[in-house]
Amino acid sequence: MNAREVALNILNEVYTQQAYANISLSRHLQKNQLSDQDRRFITELVYGTVKAGDTLLWILKKFVNRPLNKIEPTIINILRLGIYQIVFMDKIPESAACNEAVNLAKKYSNQGSAKFVNGVLRNLIRQPEKYAMPTGNKASELAIREQHPLWLVKKFIHTFGSEAAIKLCQFNNTNAPLVLRTNNFKNNTTRINH
């Protein structure tokens, strides 16, 4: 099972069985024999896709002519993974993201679904202007642009105002600094410095 397939299985559990992403991720990482690189990649795919969930669906709706509830949940999750890689992961070649998504659709659905996934993702690659992030300061636009739940953005705006809400959302999207803490009962300063 490759990294994207593991990520898909986790997303299927999260979105169809209401599993917690962190618990499902831990279980799958322990269950599968994976390299450290694959483990990091799966973690980024799962957490990134879940975090950007509303934004990914907003983008998907721009390229699909039917209601999303008429599409198999697994295909929606394959498209979420593909869109996340194409839009938010700069180091992943767009063609690789598209081809791997098509392969997953063939394996987990049928040839028609694979063609559908291919068409959606190829159009996404060809027409990036179609999913340009909204630039306004309305709650719904800010939620899409900054990948935050709408209810949280509304609460930020109500509590702190629009400008502070934007800064809060942007701050939430930064990586936390690495902080190391030692247990002074088990280690001494000399040992830690080496």
Model-derived segments and spans:
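Class I Rossmann-like S-adenosyl-L-methionine
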Residues: 1-194
